[in-house]
């Protein structure tokens, strides 16, 4: 996927491999729907090249925009290991957007820490 269509919205994240698919304006918040560029991924257990196995929606809290809360709905990839002898059958994508099982984006955490230090 190219940034040609989503370039202005993608620039807000400042992450080159995150694409903004939609921005939804609710009554009290913005929801930004994103997904990442699919890299080649090896199984974390056996290092065999994994294949895509669908997506899971992960809701993250991000920085507010113009005083309005922002949520990020990340269409996180699920991968499947093709090695029969491997003890891991599926695993999820890791990305700098958020920590594993995190509820905040990494930039929201950095902003909050900076606010506490100032």
Model-predicted segments: where are they?
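Long C-terminal interaction/binding lobes of large macromolecular proteins
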Residues: 1-31, 36
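Short, flexible, mixed-charge glycine/proline-rich loop motifs
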Residues: 30-40, 69-76
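Short, conserved catalytic/metal-binding motifs centered on acidic residues
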Residues: 32, 43, 81
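Cys/His-rich Zn2+-binding cysteine-cluster or related metal-binding knuckle/ribbon modules and their
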Residues: 36, 40, 53, 57-60
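Extended Gly/Ser/Thr-rich low-complexity repeat segments
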Residues: 38, 42-48
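Short, positively charged, Gly/Tyr-enriched micro-motifs
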Residues: 47-50, 59-118
